[in-house]
Amino acid sequence: MIIGVLKETAEGEFRVAATPETVKKLTTLKHSVHIESNAGINASITDQMYIDAGALIKSNEEVFKSDLLLKVRAPNTKEIDKLKNKQYIVGLLEPFNKEITAQLSTKKVTAFSLESLPRNTRAQSMDVLSSQANIAGYKAVILAADYYKKFFPMLMTAAGTVKAARILILGAGVAGLQAIATAKRMGAI
């Protein structure tokens, strides 16, 4: 099977659907992996790293000929127009977005939205929502620390003591728990 990895086109998107480690696993299983040129550049993954892992670097048009396409975000209208019948696409495809769902159904592709995976023990290794929420919780605290006008940890100096920041985190889901842990590690209370 030819598996294609497209460069993400959404503004501000730095993720890529496959890493060199993923490529190694897929090529070990005798799949051919086609990576769009510079697909991983925003994630600090070079084309050479993909080549070293066994992938072939292809143009956007060539990657769209793959049997299975991997994307992080849902394809836009231009990308959906390039899909061919009986092709597979896997990613965060926004299954409740009626416009995208309708466009994908007219192309007669098999679309598998990772958001729809059951969140249970058997599918835990494929649970992208939890892993992304974990990162979001961590990043939220890092950004909050940047905007906060004081310091997170308690500081004791010759000039006096600065009390630790008191942080309120709303929610105790995956993102909230990671935010709590990150803030605590940074010295906040």
Residue ranges with predicted function:
Residues 2, 77-166:
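Glycine/serine-rich phosphate-binding loop and adjoining beta1-alpha1 elements at the start
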Residues 5, 34-37, 58-59, 71, ...:
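General beta-strand structural signal in soluble alpha/beta enzymes
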Residues 6-7, 11-45, 150-189:
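Glycine-rich phosphate/diphosphate-binding loop of Rossmann-like nucleotide-binding domains
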Residues 23, 47, 80, 101, ...:
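Generic hydrophobic/aromatic pocket-lining and core-packing "Φ" positions
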Residues 54-65:
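Short acidic low-complexity segments
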Residues 61, 68-71, 75-82:
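Glycine-rich phosphate/dinucleotide-binding loop and adjoining beta-alpha-beta core of small-molecule
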Residues 66-67, 86:
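An anion/phosphate-binding loop that grips the pyrophosphate of nucleotide cofactors and donors
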